[in-house]
Amino acid sequence: MENKMFCYQCEQTAGCTGCTGNSGVCGKSANTARLQDELTGALIGLARAAEGNEHLVTEEMNQLVLEGLFTTITNVSFNDETLKLLINKIEDTKKKLVPNCFTCSGSCGKNNNFDMNTLWTTDEDVRSLKSLILFGIRGMAAYAYHASVLGYTDETISKFFYKALFAIGTKDWGMDELLPIVLEVGEVNLRCMELLDKANTTTYGTPVPTRVPLTIEKGPFIVITGHDLKDLQLLLEQTKDKGINIYTHGEMLPAHAYPKLKKYSHLKGNFGTAWQNQQKEFDNIPGAILYTTNCLMPVKPSYADRVFTTEVVSYPEIVHIGEEKDFTPVIERALALGGYTKERHMTGINGGAQVTTGFSHGTVLSVADQVIEAVKNGDIKHFFLVGGCDGARVGRNYYTEFVKQSPADSIILTLACGKYRFNDLDLGTIGGLPRIMDMGQCNDAYSAIKVAIALAEAFKCDVNELPLSMVLSWYEQKAVCILLTLLYLGIKNIHLGPTLPAFISPNVLNFLVENYGISPISTPEEDLKKLLNN
């Protein structure tokens, strides 16, 4: 290819077509992008080697696949050396599956890595469907990885990653062969989200509605960001009785609602807003910052000496906490920095001083009778699921205005970091229920699905017949696998924004419009009018 790189997997991709220059909009270099492609091609080679050798596949190999896919998600790794190490590990693993191939002079292709340039330059519809599969399994790998950290794995899920990778590397497949696999990504991701939900709730308890302050107390503190609850638990244990407060950031906010994490008195509150504001919010911060997963942005000099990474997150010259999970360097840095000398009163983007989280399916379904009665009485006339990823693109204030303008007899269900656009608003209550219910992290889309299905069963109708509208925002690959799950479930008339994915070709988009009624967002006023009149 003439391009120095090609990447169009995130919502902010250059020109809504693809990043092709010296670096991507996310900040990764062209060399990093090429190494991510090489890593993906090596994973496809591993899937080829596993074909027919399934009996030789081990849990260690499965974990390597998850790690490799997770690493290529937007804003996870900017470290070329880490990518090279993973590529080498995959090559060594292939030798265990097909040792004879490495001494064979033939060219059967059994262990060949895949050249991703052939994907980026192929027929646009094939490229589009294979991209949906690839980006979908990247997102799903993150969920499977988090579940595995808590000791939960599923053979069906593990096997599907190989199947999907193999499909991406198959040359002669067209739309007829690829479309079913696209929807299968959604099917398996539903199973994966269910597994992660089970892992989280079994380990930490069923989330309960919890008010979380946005004020930072004086004294030493650590900000933990990302999604990994196990890392948070370990950090809380290691900081007990050390005079250090812990604050969540971004997608870690829902951790406050889990009973076995709430018990730690030094888990104090939430720092700041969504991921795209971190460079401003972390500027000269007098505390340490621990990244457990995405979203990591290029680190600025004003806080680089207090940033730490762990798990698959990696950034050049930043201290990485390895598998031993000894957070001593993070703790020592927090103590040395000392924190703020007096309380710092932070707010949400609308000026609110606190937010509420913890409305998982376990909580919402426990008051299902109350919800159903409110609908029957006419107190609740509509449900909106307004959630997904946040991002920096101008126009995402659409979601703030949509929620502000939603009628007083409607409930807003939300999840993922898109909620930061409005989660500090006070919209009051309906029949004792808050109008805004934060269901959790992006993987807690499973909670929204469970609630929707339960409501449909209660009213003896199809989910699409409920007074329920989905207005979603997307940014990275976890949003892709969630969207595919909704399509697998047959959920229609989803409004998606702020832009449609660059990797959706006109023909594939036409298929989605004709079969599922997907449409781009327009204005809050127009969309509310349309959705409320359906």
Which role does the model predict for each range below?
Residues 2-32, 36-37, 41-45, 51, ...:
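Anaerobic metallocofactor- and corrinoid-dependent redox/one-carbon enzyme cores
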Residues 44-203, 209:
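Electropositive, gly/pro-rich neighborhoods at or near active sites that engage anionic ligands
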